[in-house]
Amino acid sequence: IYTLSLHDALPISSLTARVKDELSRIDGSCDECAYVELSAIMRICGTLSLQADGTYFMRMSTETGAVARVMIKLIHGLFGLDTPMTMQRSSLQRARTYLIDIPDQGKLAGVLARLGIIVPGRGQQSGIPTQLLSRRCCRQAFVRGAFMAGGFIADPTRDFHLEMALAGEELAQGIAGLLVPFGIDARINHRRGSSVLYVKSFDEIVLLLRLMEADLSVRTVESARRVKSLKNEVNRRVNAELANQARSIGAAA
């Protein structure tokens, strides 16, 4: 038995859940987009095992209900595979984890090859499936799937940043390369066995949300930035006025 990838989930914020819910409702621009999106999700959320009899078995996990629905919808709709699902709840954090099993069913190897996860005769493909990404809309779908599978976006009124926990350096570098032509300079660090791709520039995060076609989320974060900017300006003026009053009192004393 060997493992292809294991998703080390980032903590989920309420904004992250809303973004993923929005992304889960987006249909790609061409028929291939659905395959590409599923390919990204399976690479990041899936653990692939080779059984003793030579067949494959995959278990996918996510803490987001909307993403679990996308997994099941795409696997059923594209390939007609059965996907038994169980739900686990942490007694300490009360977090739900959805576990979706994909037994071989006589065709899982073909599914994995169709999605570019394995290459017949050469084994697993750990980077991005470049053969599936010739169209712009498919590159968008791959990034969208990657964020649904491993993404996190922080509160824009605080330390605003966006991250994706990815299964390996090669996949992280591949996605970072996909983002460059769109004006997004993503960086990579390593945390708890995952390669974490991150973006900290507000403008680049907005570009990334637009790339994924999360237009509602763009409006949400832009509105939050305006509120934060207004609060900062009010605080600056109040502090300046207090400083002026202190100087006046000191001069009069």
Q: Which residue stretches match the model-derived regions?
A:
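Short acidic (Asp/Glu) and glycine-rich catalytic loops that position anionic groups and cofactors
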Residues: 48-53, 122, 155, 232-236, ...
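Extended mid-to-C-terminal alpha-helical interaction segments
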Residues: 211-253
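DNA-contacting interfaces and partner/effector-binding or oligomerization modules
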Residues: 62, 68-225
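Generic, ordered loop/turn and secondary-structure boundary motif
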Residues: 2, 24, 43, 49, ...
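N-terminal, positively charged regions that mediate nucleic acid binding
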Residues: 11-57, 61-71, 75
